[in-house]
Amino acid sequence: MPSSLKLLSNLIAESVDKIEQRCAAQGVPFPELNEVLSFQSEAIRSDTDVAEAIQVIAASAAQLLATAMSPIATLSVVAHQWDVPACLGAANDANVAEILRDAGPKGAHIDDIAKRNGTNAGRLGRVLRLLASHHIFREVSPDVFANNRISSLLDSKKPVEELEKNPQSKYTETSLVNTFVSFGAGEFFKGGAFLSETLRDPVFGHSDEANHSAFNKAFKFDVSFFEWMERPENKDVLSRFSLMMRATTDLLPDAAILNGFDFGSLPDGALVVDVAGGIGSLSMVLAKTFPKLNFVVEDRPQLASDAEPYWKSNLPEALESGRVRLVAHDMFTPQPDLGSPVDVFVLRGILHDWADSYGIRLLSHLRAAAGPQTKLVVIEILLESPCRDPETSTIKGCEPRTVPEPLLANMGAADSVDYSMDMMMMGFGNGQERTLRHYVKILSETGWELKEVIHIDSLHIGPLRPHLIAVPV
């Protein structure tokens, strides 16, 4: 039998062949890393065969490294990977991508970069060299750096002078990716440093409370992350967070919403409630696509007030006609009387913010407000175990996926962002991503039955969150 090394290398070679065959068939090259990003050139990644091959390459390459490298080398790399997000955050805050945009493909010397952002040239150069070693930016000649396909995503498209005068101006509708980087390399990263202390704390380590998290230890406050953001002194954080939540929809194709639950099957005048929907970016996609459906977007008062200008700018007639209503509501209290039966409750990226006791409270209130025709649509990550599960589910859409040996059953590094998200949720509020079994459990405990899981086709941005469809019992 071939060794693991050989099996893994074969998977990579076979997957590369598949990609090149699809590129040849479509008459396009595969995007080169050293080129600046253009979304047109990325289109090939949305090909189903290419997307699947990329997943196999990512999983195989990471497992091949773990197999080939010595254990001490692997542990050393992992233990010191704090430096990558730290350096990424530093480069983002220093507007390096924008400076290099102005420099073009020839790049700029670190001395010239430092003059424009006021940093120490030697230290910033070391930051960029580490990132370039991880294929973020490229060093075209000693101490001369340029953008590549990955780093160019950090470019906010704003003038450097404007960003230096007003750093917060980086985080606007034109630069939604920066909000992910800002939180991932900032607030979430700092909170993660206190994971060990929190896990071993006799109180925090066993608490479901959102104010007993690693984030609380890191930033030394005693309210939940959401309450902390709403304090006047943290208005810039709240603004960035709102943009990040909007980005979770705006950066995804409409298929992430439209190719799941069949909203088109609802009768004219049906009511869809977007629970904790923020400014309503998900409902915006649905309202534009299904003009005969009605929508209510619920969230905390501060976020609900932020939603009004968003709708007035993008679909004012929906507000004016009353087809879309923005309602301030605490989701952990009983649902308000909305004047008509609810056909669909939508929870997108909400349950993962909270521990089970809070999730059960929310689901129970929705069940109490549900009628016999009501559907519950939960749009969340479904975690899988790295091991192969001998049990199979009878729920529609939950058939185990076929993964080639010797890859991990959950595709390992290819889907590692899901497990990183799980740690992020635990770190900033004791929330969590869940497995299928876990969702079946909390839904059944609150009077819901999971009937179907609809998986959205993988695109060049990676697998999209599935839609879990439940009905009252």
Swiss-Prot record:
InterPro entries tied to this protein: COMT-like, O_MeTrfase_dom, Plant_O-MeTrfase_dimerisation, SAM-dependent_MTases_sf, WH-like_DNA-bd_sf, WH_DNA-bd_sf
Pathway it works in: Secondary metabolite biosynthesis
Enzyme class: transferase
An annotated Gene Ontology molecular function: protein dimerization activity
Biotechnology: Melleolide sesquiterpene aryl esters are cytotoxic secondary products with anti-cancer potential. Armillaridin shows therapeutic and radiosensitizing effects on human esophageal cancer cells. Armillaridin induces autophagy-associated cell death in human chronic myelogenous leukemia as well as of hepatocellular carcinoma cells. Armillaridin can also inhibit the differentiation and activation of human macrophages and thus might have potential to be developed as a biological response modifier for inflammatory diseases.
Listed EC numbers: 2.1.1.-
GO biological process: methylation; secondary metabolite biosynthetic process
Amino-acid positions noted as binding S-adenosyl-L-methionine in the UniProt annotation, renumbered to this chain: A276, G277, D299, D330, M331, R348
Pfam families: Dimerisation, Methyltransf_2
This protein's record includes keyword S-adenosyl-L-methionine: yes
Keywords tagged on the record: Methyltransferase, S-adenosyl-L-methionine, Transferase
Active site: H352 (proton acceptor)
Record's function text: O-methyltransferase, part of the gene cluster that mediates the biosynthesis of melleolides, a range of antifungal and phytotoxic polyketide derivatives composed of an orsellinic acid (OA) moiety esterified to various sesquiterpene alcohols. The first step in melleolides biosynthesis is performed by the delta(6)-protoilludene synthase PRO1 which catalyzes the cyclization of farnesyl diphosphate to protoilludene. The orsellinic acid synthase armB produces OA by condensing acetyl-CoA with 3 malonyl-CoA units in a three-round chain elongation reaction folowed by a C2-C7 ring closure.
Other information: Armillaria species are both devastating forest pathogens and some of the largest and oldest terrestrial organisms on Earth. They forage for hosts and achieve immense colony sizes via rhizomorphs, root-like multicellular structures of clonal dispersal. One genetic Armillaria gallica individual localized in Michigan's Upper Peninsula stands out as exceptionally large, covering hundreds of tree root systems over approximately 75 hectares of the forest floor. Based on observed growth rates of the fungus, the minimum age of this large individual can be estimated as 2500 years.
Similarity-based family: Belongs to the class I-like SAM-binding methyltransferase superfamily. Cation-independent O-methyltransferase family.
Name of the protein described by the UniProt record: O-methyltransferase ARMGADRAFT_1088206
